[in-house]
Amino acid sequence: MGAWCRAHGISSLYIAHTIEDQAETFLLRLARGSGLDGLSAMQAIAPFPLAGFDELKLERPLLNVSRSSLRNVLKNAGLDWLEDPMNDDPRFSRVKIRQGWPQLEALGLTPARIADAANHLGRARQALEEATA
């Protein structure tokens, strides 16, 4: 993807990550024992170092939007979208988290609350970086 963006002069790659993706990423990193950097929220705009050139940015404008809200907007606009088949493959930990949302939500662990926690940690990380710069 990075090479394609570079070849076509594209400086921003937009990703449709939603609030559920933010929460799932937090839980996956928590399970791995990540520290502050890992538990901090995905940034809305971030460098894409895997692309092989510094100019490409990942932009995630939908991090505060639920997956169901996004789908409703697309349906109402008569637009189709593509589903990654890996999103339903139970071999992946992210899919197991998705299957467990009803149990987590019963405990008050909603995607929005988990994403809020990740955002708080992101602000804490930023404050530490600024204080030690």
Question: What kind of region is each of these model predictions?
Answer:
Residues 1-5:
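Short, well-structured alpha-helical segments in soluble
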Residues 6, 11-12, 18-133:
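Flexible helical/loop "lid" subdomain adjacent to adenine-nucleotide binding pockets
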